[in-house]
Each structure stands twice: as structure tokens, then as C-alpha cells.
Regions:
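Bacterial N-terminal signal peptides that target proteins for export
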Residues: 2-13
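A structural "domain/chain start" motif
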Residues: 25-106, 244-280
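Solvent-exposed loop/turn segments at secondary-structure junctions
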Residues: 52-54, 136-139, 190-191
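Mixed-charge, low-complexity intrinsically disordered segments
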Residues: 58-90, 142-164, 192-211
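Short secondary-structure boundary motifs at beta->alpha junctions and helix caps
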Residues: 81-88, 174-246
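Surface-exposed short loop/turn segments
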Residues: 123-186, 271-280
């Protein structure tokens, strides 16, 4: 699930929204959830950007003489002989993702700091450190199967291969309610825009056609912008659930689920592993 922020959220707005949905018949864990959201503007979050970014090209079979290259030569070749990684730079990643992640985090009620403001961060009583420990950009081929039933009689299919780009993020996070750093992980991917279909000619032969729009740098940058917003929301939700777990012996949240707070509507939702950080 995704949150959209147009401006920093005020405590008055949160109070009005949550007050309309939290009542006595609600599950017990909504009480601490409400408390966390209403008091989240007292939590200071230090965001530490990643020191370096990994670029991994899994299309090694396209690199001539790959197996005979040294480890250093392989790293150079994997980036240079790629569709997207050859165009990506650390600066693009920082502008499209890291800086945007920090921005979207400031649009919540959390107080967000970066290392140059460490002296201000330390003056807060409730502190959380979010270290973007590792960022990895992967490029590879993904298999897509197109299927159809011809004349309502038999199944035909074709396996096509499309370019794929994956963004992997490892986060080390402490919270005001747990001093031990927890390693969190999230990843998402995009591929070429692919459309494949089957047609039958006059002779009864089944023909396969496909139309692909290849991934480009602009789509990757837009993708990273969206992930920055999504992962900022994951961070808020992680701190929310951490607080609930620290205040209740049995939070009673369904297995494999976490609580998500939608700031626009002021409502809480259950989310599965596809919409949150995964603990490692």
C-alpha cells in the first residue's frame, strides 16, 4: 500500500482523523497505535545514507570471455556491458532515491535529521537511527510466459525474455523502544513493457507476436522516486509496530501481518510482506 503526502501532517489533523475511527469495540492494539501516531512528532529519526552502491549485472552470458576475467574486470564489464547500469551513477541514485526518501520521511510527523545535524538530533529524548546500510541495483533477464487457448481446444504458449531492473535495500534501524539494531530488507523490480499474443492464419498455423517497450533511464528514475515514498512509509510503519510490540505482551495482530497507518484517511490497515520491510 502507498501513502501520498502533500505537506507535513499536523497533530490536530491526526487527532481528528484517528478519533473518528478508534473506539471501544476496536482491537486492543489500536490504542497504543493511536498513541504512537499522536505523539510521533516527538520522535527524532537520523537517516544515514549508504556509503556505496552495488551495481550487479546478472546478464553475464552476454559478456565475452567473462569467466577468464579477474574479479575487478568482471565488475567493470558487468556495468559497462549493460542496458541500464552503464547509465546509472551514484549521483542519480542519491537524487532519485536517497534524497527523495529523506524528503518523504519529513512529510510524516517524524522529526528527520541527517548526519550534518547530529548535534540537534542528540538533544532529543526519543531517537531512532535509520541507516541505509546497502543499496544494490540489479539488471537481469526475466522470463514471461504468454498463453492462449486456440479454438477452445488446445493451449499454446511462448516464453519471452524481458529486461528487468531490481532495487534492493538493506536498512539497519534502531527505535526509541528497542536499542538493538534490526536489519530490514525490501526489494522491488520493473521490467520492459511486454505484450505478447497469438493469431491463427488462413492455413490454421498459430503465429506468435510480441511488442516490447524497452526499459530506459527515465522509467528507472521514476521507479526510484516511487520507491522512496513507499520505503519512507515502511519506515514509519516499522516504528509504529515496534512501539505496539513494546507496549503489549500479545499485540494480537494476525501472523505475517503488520499495521499500516494511512495518514490521508487516518485509518489503520493490515499489510502483508509485500507492503512492509522484511526483518532479516
Amino acid at each position: 500500500m502507498k501513502l501520498l503526502f502533500s505537506k507535513p501532517v499536523t497533530k490536530f489533523f491526526l487527532f481528528c482523523c484517528i478519533g473518528m475511527i478508534v473506539h471501544s469495540c476496536m482491537p486492543a492494539f489500536l490504542k497504543p497505535a493511536k498513541q504512537f501516531v499522536l505523539n510521533s512528532d516527538s520522535i527524532a529519526v537520523m537517516v544515514i545514507p549508504a556509503d556505496n552502491i552495488l551495481y550487479t549485472n546478472i546478464k553475464t552470458d552476454l559478456i565475452e570471455g567473462y569467466d577468464s576475467l579477474s574479479a575487478e574486470q568482471k565488475l567493470v564489464a558487468m556495468k559497462e556491458q549493460s542496458l541500464l547500469l552503464s547509465q546509472l551513477t551514484d549521483s542519480i541514485i542519491y537524487v532519485s532515491f536517497v534524497n527523495k526518501y529523506i524528503y518523504y520521511l519529513t512529510q510524516t510527523s517524524l522529526k528527520v535529521y541527517t548526519p550534518e545535524y547530529d548535534y540537534l538530533f542528540e538533544s532529543n529524548k526519543k531517537k531512532s537511527v535509520v541507516k541505509l546500510a546497502q543499496i544494490e541495483c540489479e539488471e537481469y533477464f526475466d522470463k514471461v510466459r504468454d498463453e492462449d487457448v486456440i479454438n477452445d481446444a488446445y493451449l499454446v504458449y511462448n516464453d519471452a525474455y524481458v529486461n528487468a531492473f531490481a532495487f534492493n535495500l538493506w536498512v539497519e534501524c534502531t527505535s526509541p523502544y528497542n536499542d538493538t539494531a534490526t536489519v530490514l530488507f525490501a526489494n522491488n523490480r520493473i521490467t520492459d513493457k511486454h505484450y505478447g499474443w497469438f493469431e491463427q492464419d488462413w492455413n490454421g498455423n498459430v503465429l506468435y507476436y510480441e511488442n516490447n517497450v524497452e526499459l530506459d533511464l527515465q522509467r528507472v528514475e521514476n521507479f526510484l522516486n516511487k520507491l522512496a515514498e513507499r520505503y519512507a512509509n515502511y519506515t514509519f510503519d516499522y516504528l509504529l509496530n515496534n512501539y505496539i510490540n513494546s507496549t503489549m505482551a500479545t499485540p494480537e495482530i494476525p501472523d505475517s501481518s503488520s499495521l499500516h497507518f494511512d495518514i490521508q484517511s487516518g485509518k489503520f490497515y493490515y499489510v502483508d510482506d509485500n507492503y512492509k520491510f522484511i526483518k532479516l
